[in-house]
UniProtKB/Swiss-Prot annotation:
Residues 317-337 are annotated as: Disordered. Residues 35-103 form the Importin N-terminal domain. Residues 317-330 have a biased composition (Acidic residues). The keyword Transport applies. This is Transportin-1. InterPro entries: ARM-like (IPR011989), ARM-type_fold (IPR016024), HEAT (IPR000357), Importin-beta_N (IPR001494), Importin_beta (IPR040122).
Length: 891
């Protein structure tokens, strides 16, 4: 190829070769890997990008598809290599793109706009002044292609880097956005829909950053939005709705004077014949409520808004769910049916987050779901006040029993579920009637009515369990439980999924109330296990794991184990180490191991060894995929580590024989140093669990474990991976209790990291704050002589954190440390006495008699040290309730 020069020209042979490759590249039957390899070869030549831009800009006679392919390849190349290109080539690419802004072919114009946007992100305004001159010329022309091409390029720049047009640039009299803004607003009145759309799209990109150019033109912009609200183009109407939603989210004060008019427009747009416009408008109601606008402004619209939402909650005729709903269990799952799954790494001290209870989270967000979410939000804001409008509509829809009205009936059931939380005060007295009405719908002929009924019942699970002691409450609970189990065995895959998810929700709420029903529950779940396909098996594993979490050791009976363990073990043995269907099974076994406790020991050895093998095979795959026979996937490691933690928690010291005969210690240390945060997080959780039950087997590499864990607590690591830091902190505390003074080499390092966490402003991870306070206490307890000289740096913040921790054995450990600190240096702690008193008063009851006596000694010691006058002065600074609680310690 020719070298780049001021007057660069392509060589015919090179041009022909690249054209041939590009033609092959866009052919569906070609060997893409080979072509890509050849393109990579050509990309080594310094003027390769010159050829690509030449083809894009001047490729007359070539197919538009090949020219477009050249442009897209150029875009990717520029992103990766522009800064290292010869200056002459850089200039050539820029100069060739500008004349093509107004190309007659729309696909070429669009590709040029995309390339310009990518190149602009690299060179910015100052590096390409000529671009803005060219854009101005195109906007000033009366040629639609030129105007559209310029607007398309500006839109893509605004979309990617809007802030870059709002900068002062040497050589330009004004910021680019100041020049463009009036032109964009003028285009609101264009007779061409594409220009109105692009102009509005450009300005909408600036709502969040709000440059002065837009702020100063706000009245004109708002008036433009009002004028475009009834635009004949659905694309424009959609962007108008998007603008109102963004404005109320980030600049509600701007909308307040116009709120009534805007709300009226959005209500009308919510009924738009175009579903995308209606969807965008529907987002307004949740946004309105989320920014805490005065709800009274919306109240007058409720009688018209609620019927609109309910109407839009019916399935549209082209909803993809309608086709899916017809699939029964005989239809094999396709790969695309499997939802992406995300394993949550083990976190010590965290509350389990609630699952998204959307009835069909896998599918695309649509008007039906947005309307249901809007009704949910309105019910939480207005509570029972929406019931007089909503309930007659629901009853009217439910009364329509003809087959043609099934979508309206289904929407009515969905709405009953949507208002479960917000309207429960008004609905609770009628819960028996609601449940009595819903249960027969579990057997409706339409599968989507059966599935939504499962979801709606799950939304009331908490309240159904609360009603158990009411008259007929237990009978009601039993009917729901059996009804959902019946649907778990439905022949329709969609209903199976909804029933299984709903049953898992009921399990979480019911907990020990499930114990009398364990036999029938397990029989149904394992019957489903024999017939479910891959997608629903994942949900079934979750239901089994949730059941184990809910009933705990009650599951540890031979009559139950015989029902569910043999099928699980069979599946466990069938799945290869590289099969991703292992993930949900590993998670399920984790819950079962914790629930069964020592009862899991009969299954433990093969499960333990499989976990070790999984981690080892992934470590091999990381460095040599061919030898491992599979690609590296860290999730296998994370799930295996978490199951080992479950075994440690369930078996307790019973895991010792398994650990002693394995290489777990060395594998675990390697995982604690992994570059992936979620691997380190699970590894450190396992380190803490093993510290509790068999610290002796960590001993040979103890200092390495301590150093690795301590490293996770430095401020940068805490900032980057707070959950890893949380588990490291907890693991160090667990080790401290077991190994005592052997932890002394890292004590000062750890304390110096914990103090900033304790002193951090509110908003830091609550679990990390609590674990830091507990671990600091444990270090103080085992090494008081090392920590005591530094107590004035942390005592007050530490005591504040101790106040927030619930009563348990970990808090007891921390207070043993507090007492050890004060005993080691009573005068050093006297300046923090009021904080110590508040911490001591935070207990509801200290169960440990020894600790109670220690606290009594500390407080009485200070009372004697200060004398009656000093003590009374200290007490006068405390809340009366705190002083009253301190009376329990004899002061």
């Amino acid at each position: 190829m020719a070298a780049a020069a001021a007057l660069w020209q392509p060589q015919e042979e090179g041009l022909r070769e690249i054209c041939t490759l590009l033609d092959a590249h866009i052919s569906p039957n070609s060997d893409q890997a080979r072509i890509w390899q050849q393109l990579q070869h050509y990309s080594q030549f310094p003027d390769f990008n010159n050829y690509l831009v030449f083809l894009l800009a001047r490729g007359e006679g070539k197919s538009f598809e090949a020219r477009q392919a050249a442009g897209l390849l150029l875009k990717n190349n520029l992103r990766a290599t522009f800064s290292s290109m010869p200056p002459a080539s850089q200039q050539y690419v820029k100069s060739e793109l500008l004349p093509c802004i107004g190309a007659t072919n729309k696909a070429i114009r669009s590709t040029v706009g995309t390339v310009i946007s990518v190149l602009f992100q690299i060179v910015r305004v100052a590096g390409w002044i000529e671009l803005f001159q060219a854009l101005h010329q195109c906007l000033d022309s009366n040629d639609l292609d030129h105007m559209e091409g310029a607007m398309d390029a500006i839109y893509k720049i605004c979309e990617d880097v809007p802030e870059e047009l709002d900068v002062d640039v040497p050589g330009l009299p004004e910021r680019p956005i100041n020049v463009f803004m009036p032109r964009l607003l003028q285009f609101f009145q264009s007779t061409h829909a594409i220009l109105r759309k692009l102009a509005l799209g450009c300005i909408n990109q600036y709502i969040v950053v709000m440059p002065a150019a837009l702020y100063m033109s706000m009245d004109q912009y708002l008036q433009g939005l009002f004028n475009l609200a009834k635009d004949p183009s659905a694309d424009v109407r959609k962007l108008v709705c998007s603008a109102w939603v963004q404005l109320i989210e980030v600049r509600p004060s701007i909308l307040e004077p116009h709120l009534k008019n805007v709300t009226e427009l959005m209500l009308q747009a919510n009924k738009d014949s175009d579903d995308e416009v209606a969807l965008e408008a529907c987002e307004f109601w949740s946004a309105y409520c989320d920014v805490s606008m005065p709800p009274e402004g919306l109240r007058e619209f409720l009688p018209r808004l609620i019927p609109t939402l309910l109407s839009n909650m019916s399935y549209s005729d082209d909803d993809e769910s309608l086709a899916d709903a017809e699939e029964d269990e005989s239809f094999p799952d396709r790969d695309q049916d499997l939802k992406p799954r995300f394993h949550a790494s083990r976190l010590h001290g965290s509350e389990t987050g609630e699952d998204d209870d959307d009835d069909d989270a896998v599918n695309v967000w649509n008007l039906r779901k947005c309307s249901a979410a809007g009704l949910d939000v309105l019910s939480n804001v207005f509570g029972d006040d929406i019931l007089p409008t909503l309930m007659p509509l629901i009853q009217q829809n439910l009364a329509r029993t003809d087959d043609d009205a099934w979508k309206e009936r289904e929407a009515a059931v969905l709405s009953i579920g949507a208002i479960a939380e917000g309207c429960i005060t008004g609905l609770y007295p009628h819960l028996p009637q609601i449940v009595a009405f819903l249960i027969p719908l579990l057997d409706d002929k339409f599968p989507l009515i059966r599935s939504i009924t499962c979801w709606t019942l799950s939304r009331y699970s908490k309240f159904i369990v609360q009603s158990l002691e009411h008259p007929n409450g237990r009978e009601q609970f039993d009917k729901i439980l059996l009804g959902l189990l019946r649907r778990v065995l439905d022949t329709n895959k969609r209903v199976q999924e909804a029933a299984c998810s709903a049953f898992a929700t009921l399990e979480e709420e019911a907990a020990e109330e499930l114990v009398p029903h364990l036999g029938i529950i397990l029989q149904h779940l394992m019957c489903a296990y024999g017939k479910y396909q891959r997608r629903n098996l994942r949900i079934l594993y979750d239901a089994l794991g949730t059941l184990a979490d809910a009933v705990g050791a009650e599951l540890n009976q031979a009559k139950y184990l015989d029902i569910f363990m043999p099928p699980l073990i069979t599946k466990w043995q069938q799945l290869a180490n590289s099969d991703k269907d292992l993930f949900p099974l590993l998670e399920c076994f984790t819950s079962i191991a914790q629930a069964l406790g020592p009862g899991f020991s009969q299954f433990a050895e093969p499960v333990f060894q499989r976990c070790i093998n999984l981690i080892q095979s992934q470590h091999l795959a990381k460095v040599d995929p061919a030898a491992a026979g599979a690609l590296y996937d860290k999730e296998f490691i994370v799930c295996a580590l978490d199951l080992l933690s479950g075994l440690a928690e369930g078996l307790g010291a019973g895991i010792e024989s398994l650990v002693s005969q394995s290489s777990l210690r060395d594998i675990l240390l390697q995982c604690c140093m992994d570059e992936a945060a979620d691997v380190r997080q699970s590894a450190l959780a396992l380190l803490g669990d093993l510290s509790r039950v068999c610290p002796i087997h960590l001993h040979p590499r103890l200092q390495e474990f301590l150093n690795v864990a301590a490293k996770q607590l430095n401020p940068q690591c805490v900032k980057e991976a707070v959950s890893v830091a949380n588990n490291a902190c907890w693991a160090i505390g667990e080790l401290a209790i077991k190994i005592g003074k052997e932890i002394s080499p890292v004590v000062i390092t750890v304390v110096s990291c914990l103090v900033p966490i304790l002193k951090s402003p509110e908003g830091l991870n609550k679990s990390l704050l609590e674990n830091s306070a507990i671990t600091l206490g444990r270090l103080c307890w085992v090494c008081p002589d090392i920590v005591a000289p530094h107590m004035d740096h942390f005592m007050q913040a530490w005591c504040n954190a101790l106040c927030m921790i619930r009563d348990d054995f970990e808090k007891e450990d921390a207070f043993h440390g507090l007492c050890a600190m004060v005993a080691a240096n009573p005068t050093g702690a006297v300046g923090s006495l009021t904080f110590i008193c508040q911490a001591c008063a935070s207990w509801n009851e200290i169960k440990s008699e020894g600790l109670h006596n220690e606290v009594c000694q500390i407080l009485n010691g200070y009372k004697q040290m200060l004398g009656s006058g000093g003590w009374e002065q200290c007490m006068s600074t405390l809340e009366p309730a705190v002083v009253q609680r301190l009376g329990r310690y004899g002061v």
